[in-house]
């Protein structure tokens, strides 16, 4: 389950970061975040073991930290849901556009930029497409039982695995094309950045943005505790041990898949990588049919995944304003307002990497790092000033500083540009 949650489209966003970090150092940073992920999840698991009964993460937090912290967590979860919906919509719209360009207009408009200027950004094309697609999303989100969309998890994993295989199999040919057409021996700027970490610390401070992106890639904590709750209820005597082993295995698997994606995406084009490898330009202006299929596949998987982020948001708002009761009027009004508002933002602001920096820097560090560790420390009923507890708080503090700095740097970049 953890692997399923982490194995999202963010896995394809790291090639551009490898150019500034250096491939080796990005892998090191990914490893560190993977270790942090395991540490903070197991802290939440240990905190949950002290609860007699729980159904979700917020109940664990209230049990150990009180109602105030549960409200804080719910606030961040609402922000997280809104941000993810906007991020996914900002990705879905251009993915469908790239699919249309690659499949039907490749001869007339060789690049997506050409297609965008000539067709895609024309109001008479873009506006109806956005309205219709968002309307279909609203219909999907009106469903009250999330279990009816369980198939979306399988579509998502299948889309990611398929795309990963395409990138892996084709990266050798793309790297060869890069060496023959872009690599210049005398020009070091065209060389692959294997180990130079310095570029990540230049004026744009890409290190902090890259780390915030990694925090988002591993943001899975709230979603796994309902699964763990059921496991604990069924296996009360060995729940914690099994949870920790499952978390370790899933973290190793997720990190290994991230490694494969980072390496193969980087080798696809070390000199001019796209924000997402699925945006890559085909060799010799060919159609790259397998990646065309991948774009459509991922766009569809994201479309069916979005309700999974919307349902908790709707429930949180209903709990806050209607006592948890979701009437038909509330359901229809809130669904259409939320979906169209998020779509409007996504149609104007479509910087995927910046969305990931904001989510990781301002939200994930709190719901995935600070709150689980605090719940664990309070569950021990020991002074927070005890040396081992203090070390954990310092580690969390460093992660929060890195994340928030990444978010602030991203804001500064947006203001400049």
Each model region followed by its residue ranges:
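Alpha-helical transmembrane segments of multi-pass integral membrane proteins
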Residues: 1-4, 29-33, 212-213
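Membrane-interface "cap" regions at the ends of multi-pass membrane proteins
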Residues: 1-16, 37-42
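Alpha-helical transmembrane segments and their membrane-interface exit regions
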Residues: 32, 36-40, 160, 364-371
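Membrane-interface recognition of transmembrane alpha-helix starts
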Residues: 1-9, 79, 394, 398
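Membrane-interfacial loop- and helix-cap regions that link adjacent transmembrane helices
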Residues: 42, 48-74, 86-129, 153-156, ...
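Extracellular loop-to-transmembrane helix junctions
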Residues: 17-47, 54, 58
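Membrane-water interface regions at transmembrane-helix termini and the short interhelical loops
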Residues: 15-21, 134-156, 230, 344-355
């Amino acid at each position: 389950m953890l692997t399923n949650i982490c194995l999202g489209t963010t896995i394809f966003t790291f090639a551009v970061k490898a150019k500034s970090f250096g491939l080796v150092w990005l892998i090191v940073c990914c490893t560190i975040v993977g270790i942090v992920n395991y540490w903070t999840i197991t802290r939440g698991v240990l905190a949950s073991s002290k609860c007699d009964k729980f159904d979700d993460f917020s109940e664990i937090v209230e049990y150990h930290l009180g109602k105030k912290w549960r409200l804080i967590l719910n606030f961040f979860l609402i922000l997280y849901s809104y941000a993810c919906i906007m991020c996914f919509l900002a990705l879905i719209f251009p993915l469908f556009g790239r699919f249309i360009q690659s499949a039907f207009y490749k001869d007339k408009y060789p690049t997506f930029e050409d297609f965008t200027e000539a067709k895609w950004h024309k109001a008479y094309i873009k506006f109806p497409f956005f309205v219709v697609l968002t309307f279909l999303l609203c219909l999907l989100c009106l469903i009250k039982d999330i279990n009816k969309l369980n198939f979306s998890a399988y579509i998502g994993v299948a889309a990611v695995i398929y795309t990963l295989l395409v990138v892996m199999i084709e990266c050798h040919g793309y790297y060869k094309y890069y060496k023959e057409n872009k690599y210049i021996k005398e020009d070091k700027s065209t060389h692959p950045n294997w180990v130079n970490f310095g570029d990540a610390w230049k004026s744009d401070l890409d290190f902090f943005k890259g780390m915030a992106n990694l925090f988002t890639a591993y943001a899975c904590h709230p979603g796994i505790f309902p699964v763990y709750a059921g496991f604990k209820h069924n296996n009360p005597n060995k729940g914690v041990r099994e949870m920790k082993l499952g978390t370790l295995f899933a973290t190793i698997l997720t990190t290994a898949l991230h490694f494969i994606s980072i390496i193969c995406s980087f080798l696809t084009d070390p000199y001019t990588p796209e924000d997402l490898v699925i945006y890559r330009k085909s060799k010799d202006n060919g159609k790259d049919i397998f990646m065309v299929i991948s774009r459509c596949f991922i766009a569809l998987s994201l479309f069916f995944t979005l309700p999974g982020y919307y349902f908790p948001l709707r429930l949180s708002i209903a709990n806050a304003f209607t006592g948890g009761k979701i009437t038909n009027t509330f359901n229809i009004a809130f669904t259409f307002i939320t979906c169209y508002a998020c779509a409007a933002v996504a149609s104007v602001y479509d910087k995927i990497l910046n969305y990931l920096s904001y989510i990781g820097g301002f939200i994930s560090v709190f719901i995935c790092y600070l709150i689980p560790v605090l719940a664990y420390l309070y569950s021990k009923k020991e002074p927070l000033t005890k040396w081992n507890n203090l070390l954990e708080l310092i580690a969390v503090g460093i992660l929060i500083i890195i994340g928030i700095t990444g978010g602030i740097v991203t804001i500064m970049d947006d203001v400049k540009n």
